[in-house]
């Protein structure tokens, strides 16, 4: 950390605080949505948070032509002001205004990530260090953010958690304003070429069974994420007045993810043991989460669920990186990013149109389908490796 240059430190400080605010405000927004007494509003919170991801793959075209520091700066300022403004909106009133303001904040936020990644690539010798530290800071920020939100709620106001998020964005903007990088515009592909790249990514997914399996894994997990997010307010009711439970469950995201990341090397890649652990954990943890009336059991189920999701995410990314040409990977991940945002939104709406047993049955069918497809792909992977080794011997 001490070896980092000032620009790298400012970026890391700002993002750690901003990410902390994100996971402090997520449960707070879910709590505020329950005051409307309509689960479509709860689903709406998740949809407006996720659906802008569909457009993110095409934003690199704009980011490459504009000053990335200014994009990050103004995005954080806009988000900070709107979140502070949300605290003045009466609870349970004006649902369309509530969702519209959230859509503006998360919609503007999709410009931020491409700009941040581009800035990180300009940090020269600090690139590896900043990426490693950012990954660690992400997990810690989720845990600390959820804990901070819980403390605000115990202090008597869920709006404080929303205000805290607004403040973290403004503090992040302050650090970003101190980053000194010379802006060099890049003449990147136009919109038509961006769509062509997207189509090439789709073509690779269709023709490469390993990449198709990675995509299947990512969209399955996105559906599961949407379902679990939408059930946070319901499950939280089994603890007191139900509000503090949302923050505890958000804490489980970071804690489960931390454990899941540590288990990746032990469970292994492209083998049936890890696949079995992932499948069993996903189904059992989700069933417990949806049906148990005991909050402590729900917490354990949530941790197990997020362990499985972290493992699956790493597995899917590695499968793309190992089995697709380097020049096509960005296009594949662009398709994945858009699909994930769409599937989280779809999963979050199941609660409004399907009963819990039907949702669970649908998830079991999808996850079992993924299990069978992955098993076939793993077999192909082993056969390919064996052929490569035999050629090496001769």
UniProtKB/Swiss-Prot annotation:
InterPro entries: Bacilysin_exporter_BacE_put, MFS, MFS_trans_sf. Its main location: membrane. One of its GO terms (molecular function) is transmembrane transporter activity. It is found in: Cell membrane. Gene3D superfamilies: MFS general substrate transporter like domains. It holds the Pfam family MFS_1. This is Putative bacilysin exporter BacE. It comes from Bacillus subtilis (strain 168). The gene is bacE.
